[in-house]
Amino acid sequence: MENWAVQSPEEPGFHAVVTPDKSSCKEAWIYRLNLNKGDSHTLKSGRLEMHPVLCEGAAVLSGNSALEGVRLEKYDSFYIPGETDVIITAQEDCFFYVAAAVCEGYGEIFVRKFDPSLPIGDIHQIHGEGTGRREVMFTLAPQDKASRLLCGFTWGGEGTWTSWPPHQHEADLEEVYCYFDMPKPHFGFHISYLKSADVEEVMAHHMRARARRRPKHGGRPSRCLPCNRSPFR
């Protein structure tokens, strides 16, 4: 469990953060794209489906007829299936987390604009109660046309749990948590354990803006320090 946390790079460029050949994950890839204002990057999906989510800044898309001229602002996202290219140009300094998985030939390009006013339903959801209450906003929902990926944002309250009680999805999901919006001195803890309902042996990882991977076993409550929120996607 010691190596389950990975610091995502902050320098400009397109960076592989979690990949099956270098982690315990077998199905999931996570990339981070950092662009300075005015810089561009051509995203090429190849054999993967990709889901970039803008966590900071603003950008515009080009080079693909289905996405031409689309402007992205904070928390907006889009999806591309395999063998698809798109140019991302930063209108402000920005960074994306990019989730990816093997494309099985199923998936359609789409853009999802972040809308916090959406009613509770398929995209906007509330889970848990009390200090375990959390708000979920899907960026790539179960009903969307994609091969393997499910993605979304989760926000907890200030100083509360964002995943409580401890639970896991090892029967059918491999999960990666990408933390954001926690600049210094803000931080939280991601607590990992291997055996269901056995929390005697746990590992706590310090979290700011980094990725935390988890294979198909173990659990993961996460906790934010007082006066902080612990958002992840």
Q: Could you describe each region identified by the protein language model?
A:
Residues 2-10:
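Non-transmembrane, aqueous-exposed alpha-helical and coiled segments at domain scale
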Residues 9-40, 129-177:
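A short glycine-rich, His/Asp/Glu-containing loop-to-beta-strand
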Residues 22, 29-98:
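Extended, compositionally biased flexible segments
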Residues 41-46, 163-169, 205, 223-225:
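Short histidine-centered beta-strand/loop micro-motifs
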Residues 46-65, 171-209:
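Glycine- and acidic-residue-biased ligand/ion/polar-headgroup-sensing regions
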Residues 72-91, 99-101, 204-229:
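Conserved metal-binding segment of the jelly-roll/cupin
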Residues 73-130:
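Hydrophobic alpha-helical segments and helix pairs
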Residues 177-180, 224-233:
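A short beta-strand-loop micro-motif that forms or neighbors metal/cofactor-
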